[in-house]
Design a protein with these regions (language model features):
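Bacterial N-terminal signal peptides that target proteins for export
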Residues: 1-10
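Predominantly soluble domains enriched in secretory-pathway, periplasmic, or organellar proteins
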Residues: 11-329
Length: 329
């Protein structure tokens, strides 16, 4: 295996390249652009980023034998700490209890102020995605094998319950008022969940449009609009009425979307794509949408995080170093 280093990107609206990157919003006349890139280094795979806008911290979980949870100052992209032996795909923080969680197995719960591990929490399945729901201060652990969702009390660090969503859970969003929506990657629909009672109340089916392999999901909670991203047979976003599941329209995206976000400050749905692009979709009204910009980032930069304080978007990817001369092929 070739060694690689991670990087973060920043831009007038985006983050980019073999490091962590960040992008920043610009007026309509000026497109989004990459503002900054920062070399991260280190070993291990990577998946999701988590931005704690209030505490000004960016969390980057790393997997593999040398995996750890690396923490950065979100304004400078300088490292501020790490939690060793936390080999995870995703992380989330409850700003009220200052408890953080990462999708290790068992789940690791840590103090977001001190970065000290508080406890581990046994769960079933194969943890992957993660979401914090401020409605009732719970953390949702998502996976592609049953149980598809495990819900944890963020204050106590105890399992509240598990939920069979009917398919592999890719990304979840909350309206903050008692509803959670989950894009199911293998059955072509969106599960609607009562967050208080942990019951599935509806499935919004998009299979009639021929879409498969669901990935990212974003929500305009004010206007009740869902943005559900699909990779097959073509890369598109299906824009759905969150109240009844009716499809409003569809738009093209870049190839290989993973995580997405909706920025209510700019009324844009933003997706990071494995082919090295970031797509910005403008919501002109609850029934009118358009692809505003496709920004070139770097191959592999398929996940993102939004800094809601600055409207910066951060993404990351890996640069592969040349293999040593004596390396086995």
């Amino acid at each position: 295996m070739r060694p690689f280093c991670l990087g973060v990107l920043l831009a007038g609206g985006i983050a980019m390249v073999a490091s962590v990157g960040l992008a920043q919003y610009a007026p309509a006349a000026a497109p989004y652009k990459v503002l900054k890139t920062a070399k991260v280094g280190g070993e291990g795979g990577f998946d999701y980023l988590f931005a704690d806008a209030e505490a000004r911290r960016l969390y980057m979980p790393r997997s593999g034998p040398m995996g750890q949870l690396t923490v950065f100052n979100m304004d400078t992209l300088e490292p501020v700490g790490a939690i060793a032996d936390v080999r995870a795909g995703g992380a989330a923080v409850d700003p009220k209890s200052h408890h953080g969680f990462s999708t290790t197995k068992p789940i690791t719960m840590w103090d977001s102020t001190t970065l000290k591990v508080v406890k581990t929490i046994d769960v079933e399945g194969r943890p992957d995605g993660i979401m914090f729901d401020p409605y009732n201060e719970r953390v949702w652990i998502l996976g592609h094998t049953p149980p598809y969702a495990t819900v944890i009390d963020a204050k106590e660090g105890t399992v509240v319950g598990t939920l069979d969503l009917g398919g592999g859970a890719e990304q979840a969003v909350t309206d903050g008022r008692g509803k959670v929506y989950v894009n199911l990657s293998d059955i072509f629909n969106i599960a609607v969940v009562d967050a208080k009672n942990l019951t599935v109340t509806a499935h919004y089916d998009v299979s009639s449009k021929g879409y498969g392999f669901g990935s990212g999901l974003a929500l305009d909670y004010k206007n009740h609009v869902l943005f559900a991203y699909y990779r097959e047979p073509s890369a598109e976003v299906v824009i759905v009425n969150a109240d009844n599941g009716n499809i409003i329209t569809t738009l093209p995206t870049g190839v290989g979307v993973d995580t997405v976000v909706f920025n209510p400050a700019t009324m844009e749905a933003i997706s990071a794509e494995n082919n090295g692009s970031m797509t910005f979709i403008k919501e002109n009204s609850p029934t009118s949408f358009a692809v505003e910009q496709t920004l070139l980032t770097k191959s592999g930069a398929k996940t993102l995080a939004l800094d809601t304080k600055t409207n910066h978007v951060l993404t990351m990817t890996a640069d592969f170093a040349p293999a040593p001369a004596n390396a086995r092929k």
